Amino acid sequence: MEKLPCVYILAKASHGTLYTGVTSDLPGRVWQHREGLIRGFTQRYGIKRLVWFERHDSMDSAIIREKRIKRWPRAWKYDLIHEHNPSWRDLAEEFGFPPLLLK
C-alpha cells in the first residue's frame, strides 16, 4: 500500500477535546487510535473520531503543518474543521471504518 503523508485531527465530540497528529498511513493510524494501541493523550481521553485530515506530498511538509496547527488556538482548529466538515462526521468512513457516533 502506498504511503501518503497526512496531518489529521481527532475529536472526542463535536467542539470537544482535540488531538492533532501526523502519519504516513492514515487508515493504519486511525485503526491504532480506535483500538487504543497508541498510549498517551488519545487513549487516556478516548479521542477516536477523525474529523479533519489534509494530504501532503512529503512527510516534511506534513510535519511542518502539524506543528503550525498545534500552536493554533482551539477556536482556529474548530474553524478549520467546520470549514471542511461542518457536521463533524467521522471521516474514517472514507477508509471503510464504521462511523463513531457523536457524544
Say what each PLM segment does:
Residues M1-R39, Q43-R55, D60-K67, H84-P86, ...:
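GIY-YIG nuclease catalytic motif and its immediate N-terminal context
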Residues L26, W72-P73:
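A short acidic/small-residue loop/turn micro-motif
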Residues A75-I81:
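A short, polar/charged loop-to-alpha-helix boundary motif
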